[in-house]
C-alpha cells in the first residue's frame, strides 16, 4: 500500500494528517501551475523611450556671452579680428605656461605679470609728449639745490634756448634775451647785478675783438693791429753812415777851396 492510499483510506495517523494539511497549504500558497507547457509566454511590454531633452528656450534679448562675443567679433574688420585672436591665443599660452610652472613647483613670476611689467618699462622709456600747457617747472632739473645741480640746469637751459637765435635773431634779442636777463636779475642783490653787468662788459669786449678780427680778415692786406687798408711804409736804404744829412755839400755856400792861378804853377 502506498503512502497516498493510506491518506485516502484514512489509515494515516493524526500526525500524518497534520503533515499533509501543512503540505497542502504550502502548495496552495504557490503560484498556479501552467496548464500547458506549450503556452506562449506573455510578450514583454516595450520599455518606455527616454524623453529627448528639449533645448532651453532663450528669451529674446538675452543671448549668451559666447554668442554675444562671437557676434561682436564678426562685426569687426579682418585686421582687428586677427589681432584679437592673436591676443587671445597669447593669453591662453601664458595661462598654460603659468599652470605648468605651478605644477612643476617653479617659483617664478607669472608670465602675464612679466609681460605687463616689460610693457610698462617700454612706455616709461618713451619720450613724454609735452604740450604748451605742460608746466616747465615740473621737470626734475628745476628741483636744483646744490651748486652742481644749478650748473646742470644752466647748461640745459643754454642748450635749449641759444639755438633759437638762428630762427629769428631780432626776436631772440629784443623779445627774449634782454627781457629775460632783466627778469632773472630782479630778485638779485645790487652787488650780484653789478657782477652780472661786469660779466656782460667782458662779453662786449670779447665780441668787439672777434668782430674786428673777422672784418680785417676779409680786407686784403689788412693787419690785426692796424686800420683796414692801411698801406705799409717802405723802409729807407741803409748806406752804412757814409753820407749823413749834416755832411751834405752846400753848393750855394762860400767856396772854401778856392785855388789861385799861382797854385797850378
Swiss-Prot record:
One of its GO terms (biological process) is formation of cytoplasmic translation initiation complex. It holds the Pfam family eIF3_subunit. Disruption phenotype: Marked reduction in binding of the eIF-3 core complex to 40S ribosomes. The keyword Repeat does not apply. InterPro entries: eIF3-like_dom_sf, eIF3j. Component of the eukaryotic translation initiation factor 3 (eIF-3) complex, which is involved in protein synthesis of a specialized repertoire of mRNAs and, together with other initiation factors, stimulates binding of mRNA and methionyl-tRNAi to the 40S ribosome. The eIF-3 complex specifically targets and initiates translation of a subset of mRNAs involved in cell proliferation. Probable component of the eukaryotic translation initiation factor 3 (eIF-3) complex. Is not part of the eIF-3 core complex, with which it is associated in substochiometric amounts. This is Eukaryotic translation initiation factor 3 subunit J.
